[in-house]
């Protein structure tokens, strides 16, 4: 609101009149969705309203009221700022200041978000020379009312001072900096329709640059000048129209300026475009795919246009650097360029050859505008005949099999849509978002991220990131089979049905068509089928159980398959979201790999031999720490076989050293240390067992912001609980060594209390989880041996969730034997091994499942 006195009745009447007219326009837009008409009508409505206020303020005819920025362009979105310039003559009466201030205040009273400046012509030119943002807004200045002569003088002086080359350089730099803020990708979960790469601002930037250079101010004019083709002009207009419509609809839905396509509005925005949910895809996912395709096209065409404008503003001082392929390609200033516009039409096989040359030629850093345009206009050439051409299939395999440059080549193939033209099923998942609370990338971006992760394992400069993976891939023959598996592992997402099974068929067809040897083809197809198997076994099953390992080893079959699956699994999890991977998951997978490898090598996965081996290793470690030879017996005699199978030798030794003097302790023993795997805290609890113990410990962790990754619960023969937890702090940059003592003292004190368990705190869900909640699921079943019951819980992640589950179990006096907490982005899939009287009773099972569903509901 303005800083002046309260609006007069007349001002309030005008405001109501303006609002009613605007509301009618927005209603027409809701019905007809003609965004150009809406923006023009809003601009005209605003013009007329400001003219009336200008006249009422009695401002002299020597001044001019000028619309600048988007308003000057005549493109007002429903709740955009209205940027105006009050243009003053060089000599003016200072007494005008009060009237100008009154004018601006009355403009605010209309309900407009006014952005105003008051300057002389000279001040405008000076400000523009210092600030490219001011220079840009003035580029589209339009007189609303006032002195025509003054405005024309401003226009002449402005264009005389405008340096097209300097403006180009500044705007391109500004665009790069803006893109960097959005991680240089249009594929954001919540893109900014205006500012993100491929958004409206990119289109505006091109037109600003072209206008400043005198090349035109519309796509039609750029087409006439030869900077773009008719087809490109149509594509630009079509995508610009979609983005403007989407932005306007966001404003209307939100009832305010809203340029971010946030989760909360994606479903409503999708419905406003007529999208409806299907069995395979949400309405929001369909809208986001349309948006990503538009942003991708804008990015591609913007690259072509900017290079073309640059070539005209900065004529090259040197021509061809070298010939790369006679009659096809040359290198020109570090860019791969076709020798003429008809290369791809004469030689369709040159399309894929371009990417092979880009990948293998040192010094080539990209494709020239001419090459990009030719690719863009070669879509009809990339047909079934082209896909089936043996030479093209050979070139595609050569691209996959190069020692370096693969990731960059495939990203460029995707950006130019060539990859989707060659692999039609890949085209189906380009821009497909997965609102599963797990993946934060579109399916095509996730696939390329997995490919990139596998490639990094093989690159020496990145060997320090995942040394074990780098070691394995260094000895893995024909690693390109992993790249093919990466390309196909999620290619069938969104089709309905099991994507692993559907993807197998696609992979099998690809291998057959590309002449891949039968043993390599079998591995590729198997990897696509089983790409989720290893993570499910490691994160959801009891890998201390020899039977689990034996079954997994039977599925894998041999070392090459195991290594391939391990490398693909690590790359896949790391490619879902920056938040999903952690060292604990890495440890689970590596342990499963090593144990399975031993079994494949002939080791017998029976409990007795494993028990003996771990005990011997633990005793050796205890001797190194000068623990008396037989001191361990007081504790070990009270432990069952399960304890020794659930913990490795180092863990057994640590717990023994802590507890051998306190086997019959009257008070709780709590010890904490930074987890040996890093990025976590290991907490040991030893105390007389009771039904609510697990829940009480979880309550403490919940209240103190500690998330449980893993829980291993044991009960001694003389009634003590020996529980181990791996926890992480929700705050970043925590030093676990610093909080270990605090956890020991506080948790030990908490365990002495006899107060009833507190009510769980239902922590607030993230916006993503609130917008795309998953249906909570609870499944309770007996294990294969009938010894325990397995409880599986799937729900939206939130603070307090684990404690809510534990409290229900405690109320029914059900003991938790083990817990595997699996957090997948915004979703949890937890597994509990339960023991308790009455669990075989169907009525108790139904009651338990009902109460758990109520406890985990959002």
UniProtKB/Swiss-Prot annotation:
One of its GO terms (biological process) is nitrogen fixation. Has four distinct domains: an N-terminal nucleotidyltransferase (NT) domain responsible for UTase activity, a central HD domain that encodes UR activity, and two C-terminal ACT domains that seem to have a role in glutamine sensing. Residues 325-681 are annotated as: Uridylyl-removing. Uridylyltransferase (UTase) activity is inhibited by glutamine, while glutamine activates uridylyl-removing (UR) activity. Residues 1-324 are annotated as: Uridylyltransferase. This is Bifunctional uridylyltransferase/uridylyl-removing enzyme. Belongs to the GlnD family. One of its GO terms (molecular function) is phosphoric diester hydrolase activity. Residues 443-565 form the HD domain. It comes from the Bacteria. It catalyses: [protein-PII]-L-tyrosine + UTP = [protein-PII]-uridylyl-L-tyrosine + diphosphate; [protein-PII]-uridylyl-L-tyrosine + H2O = [protein-PII]-L-tyrosine + UMP + H(+). Its EC number is 2.7.7.59, 3.1.4.-. The gene is glnD.
């Amino acid at each position: 609101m303005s800083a002046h006195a309260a609006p007069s009745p007349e001002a309030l009447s005008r405001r109501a009149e303006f609002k009613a007219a605007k509301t009618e326009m927005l209603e027409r837009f809701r019905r007809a969705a003609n965004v150009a008409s809406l923006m023009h009508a809003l601009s005209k409505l605003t013009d007329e309203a400001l003219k009336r206020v200008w006249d009422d303020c009695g401002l002299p005819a020597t001044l001019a009221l000028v619309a600048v920025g988007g308003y000057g362009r005549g493109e007002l979105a429903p709740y955009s700022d209205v940027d105006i310039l009050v243009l003053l003559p060089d000599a003016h009466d200072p007494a005008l200041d009060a009237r100008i201030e009154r004018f601006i205040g009355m403009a605010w009273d209309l309900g407009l978000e006014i952005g105003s400046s008051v300057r002389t012509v000279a001040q405008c030119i000076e400000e523009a020379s210092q600030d490219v943002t001011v220079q840009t807004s003035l580029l589209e200045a339009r007189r609303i009312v006032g002195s025509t002569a003054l405005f024309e003088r401003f226009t002449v002086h402005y264009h005389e001072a405008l340096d097209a080359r300097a403006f180009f350089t500044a705007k391109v730099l500004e665009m790069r900096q803006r893109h960097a803020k959005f991680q240089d990708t249009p594929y954001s979960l919540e893109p900014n329709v205006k500012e993100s790469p491929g958004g409206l601002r990119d289109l505006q930037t091109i037109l600003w640059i072209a206008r400043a250079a005198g090349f035109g101010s519309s796509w039609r004019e750029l087409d006439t000048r030869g900077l773009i083709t008719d087809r490109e002009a149509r594509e630009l207009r079509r995508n610009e129209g979609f983005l403007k419509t989407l932005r306007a609809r966001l404003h209307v839905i939100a009832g305010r300026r809203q340029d971010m396509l946030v989760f909360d509005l994606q479903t409503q925005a999708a419905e406003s475009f007529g999208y409806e949910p299907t069995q395979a895809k949400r309405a929001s996912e369909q809208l986001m795919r349309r948006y990503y395709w538009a942003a991708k096209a804008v990015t591609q065409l913007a690259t072509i246009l900017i290079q073309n404008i640059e070539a005209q503003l900065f004529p090259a001082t040197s021509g061809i650097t070298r010939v790369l392929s006679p009659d096809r390609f040359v290198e020109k200033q570090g860019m791969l360029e076709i020798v003429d516009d008809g290369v791809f039409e004469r030689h369709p096989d040159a399309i894929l050859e371009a990417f092979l040359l880009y990948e293998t030629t040192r010094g080539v850093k990209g494709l020239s505008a001419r090459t990009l345009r030719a690719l863009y206009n070669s879509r009809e050439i990339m047909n079934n005949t082209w896909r089936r051409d043996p030479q093209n299939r050979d070139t595609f395999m050569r691209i996959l099999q190069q020692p370096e440059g693969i990731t960059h080549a495939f990203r460029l193939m995707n950006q130019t849509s060539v990859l989707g033209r060659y692999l039609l099923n890949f085209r189906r998942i380009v821009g497909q978002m997965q609102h599963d609370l797990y993946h934060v990338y579109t399916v095509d971006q996730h696939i390329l991220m997995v490919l990139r992760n596998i490639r990094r394992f093989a690159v020496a400069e990145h060997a320090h990131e995942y040394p074990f993976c780098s070691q394995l891939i260094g000895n893995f023959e024909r690693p390109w089979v992993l790249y093919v598996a990466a390309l196909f592992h999620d290619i069938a997402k969104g089709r309905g049905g099991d994507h692993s099974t559907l993807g197998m068929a696609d992979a099998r067809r690809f291998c057959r068509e590309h002449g891949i040897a039968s043993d390599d083809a079998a591995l590729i197809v198997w990897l696509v089928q089983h790409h989720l198997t290893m993570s499910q076994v490691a994160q959801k099953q009891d890998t201390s159980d020899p039977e689990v390992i034996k079954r997994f080893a039977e599925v894998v079959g041999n070392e090459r398959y195991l290594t391939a699956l391990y490398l693909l699994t690590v790359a896949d999890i790391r490619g879902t979201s920056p938040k999903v991977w952690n060292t604990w998951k890495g440890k689970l997978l590596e342990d499963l790999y090593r144990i399975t490898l031993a079994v494949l090598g002939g080791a017998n996965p029976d409990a007795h031999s494993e028990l003996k081996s771990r005990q011997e290793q633990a005793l050796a470690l205890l001797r190194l720490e000068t623990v008396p030879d037989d001191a361990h017996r007081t504790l070990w005699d009270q432990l069952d076989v399960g304890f020794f199978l659930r913990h490795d030798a180092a863990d057994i030794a640590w717990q023994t050293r802590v507890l051998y003097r306190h086997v019959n302790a009257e008070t709780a023993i709590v010890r904490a240390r930074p987890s040996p795997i890093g990025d976590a805290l290991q907490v040991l609890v030893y105390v007389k067992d009771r039904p609510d113990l697990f829940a009480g410990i979880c309550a403490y962790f919940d209240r103190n912001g500690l998330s449980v990754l893993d829980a291993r619960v044991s009960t001694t023969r003389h009634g003590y609980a020996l529980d181990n937890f791996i926890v992480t702090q929700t705050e970043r940059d925590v030093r676990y060594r610093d909080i270990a003592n605090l956890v020991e003292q506080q948790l030990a004190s908490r365990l002495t209390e006899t107060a009833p368990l507190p009510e769980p705190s239902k922590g607030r869900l993230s916006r993503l989880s609130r917008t795309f909640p998953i249906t909570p699921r609870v499944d309770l079943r007996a294990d294969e041996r009938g010894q325990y019951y397995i409880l599986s819980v799937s729900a939206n992640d939130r603070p307090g969730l684990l404690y809510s589950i534990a409290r229900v179990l405690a109320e029914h006096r059900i003991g938790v034997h083990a817990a595997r907490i699996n957090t997948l982005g915004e979703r949890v899939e937890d597994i509990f091994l339960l023991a308790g009287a009455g669990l075989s009773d169907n009525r108790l099972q139904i009651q338990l499942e009902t109460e758990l569903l109520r406890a985990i509901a959002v």
